């Protein structure tokens, strides 16, 4: 397994446990990016660290990819792997293809064109939610039987055994009398870059000046952390490092996220969630919006800042079914 982003740790945690319970040998590689290493440590997953993120520039990403592919091949060669699993890591599927190892990759956003052109064509199987129309994947060379689809959200599978820790509120000094808003930064490395999502700073400024609100902002990088802290907004809290984000979401009154994973975690846990994503919506988000489980946000003043009164509808699914679809052998 190759883990290249923080969310992948959560996806693979129950699958690793299931495989080891049945006697499989599992080895994990990881890329040093954002909170990936911290989350691996928190969940007790040992991994071989290989490479790092290439940053914003295409040249940097290409150079980093070439170097990491070479290191992955050297590491994997001669280890007699029977299968390789990835969540969107084209590094893994390309390496597996070069070494003749059956592989599968999964993702839930179909418009990451460059990544999917590489990863999908190299993979033996591609596993995606059934909310993604199959015809959108044909340009990546993905058709049945290579295509496998599952019902619901991947978050409904990996959160199936999750029970939130209320102590996370004390760890972050959350005032329970105020409206708790969990905010996830955009994927942009630089929040203040001219091409960055302009809505996100507006949301921060709006929430940060509301006395009735405590907004906990979860940055992706240290650069983002420094930027948000530098705004000195009175109602904004920025944790020092990786936190139990799923527990925080479970106790939140609402979630505002520019990324995909935290939106879907909130939806899976039945928490009101708004998306500020500025790109093209994928099939999963389109379905969630149709179902009323995700709300698009274009103006911060449209946020319903109220205490959540009742438990939302939580959906749990069986991780073993996800593992069955992912196994390429």
What does each of the following model-derived ranges do?
Residues 84-95, 105-106, 248-285:
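A donor-sugar binding/catalytic signature common to diverse glycosyltransferases
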């Amino acid at each position: 397994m190759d883990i290249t982003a923080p969310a992948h740790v959560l996806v693979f945690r129950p699958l690793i446990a299931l495989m080891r319970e049945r006697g499989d040998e599992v080895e994990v590689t990881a890329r040093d990016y954002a909170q990936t290493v911290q989350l691996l440590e928190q969940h007790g997953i040992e991994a071989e660290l290989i490479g790092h993120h290439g940053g914003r520039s295409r040249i940097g990403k290409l150079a980093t990819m070439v170097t990491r592919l070479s290191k992955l091949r050297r590491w994997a060669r001669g280890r007699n792997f029977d299968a390789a699993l990835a969540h969107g890591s084209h590094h893994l599927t390309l390496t597996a293809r070069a070494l003749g190892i059956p592989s599968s990759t999964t993702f839930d956003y179909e418009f990451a064109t460059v990544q999917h052109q590489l990863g999908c064509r190299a993979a033996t199987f591609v596993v995606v939610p059934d909310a993604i129309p199959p015809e959108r994947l044909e340009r990546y060379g993905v058709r049945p039987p290579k295509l496998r689809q599952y019902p619901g959200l991947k978050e409904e599978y990996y959160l199936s055994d999750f029970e939130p820790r209320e102590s996370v509120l004390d760890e972050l000094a959350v005032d329970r009398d105020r409206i708790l808003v969990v905010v996830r930064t955009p994927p942009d490395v630089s929040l203040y870059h001219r091409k960055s999502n302009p809505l996100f700073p507006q949301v921060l400024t709006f929430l940060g000046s509301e006395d009735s609100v405590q907004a906990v902002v979860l940055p992706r990088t240290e650069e983002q952390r420094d930027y948000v802290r530098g705004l000195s907004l009175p109602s904004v809290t920025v944790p020092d490092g990786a936190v139990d984000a799923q527990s925080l979401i479970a106790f939140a009154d609402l979630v505002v996220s520019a990324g995909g994973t935290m939106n879907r975690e909130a939806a899976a846990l039945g928490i009101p969630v708004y998306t500020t994503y500025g790109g093209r919506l994928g099939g999963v988000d389109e379905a969630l919006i149709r179902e009323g489980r995700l709300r698009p946000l274009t103006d911060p003043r449209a946020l319903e800042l109220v205490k959540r009164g009742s438990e939302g509808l939580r959906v749990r699914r069986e991780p073993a079914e996800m593992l069955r679809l992912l196994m390429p052998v």
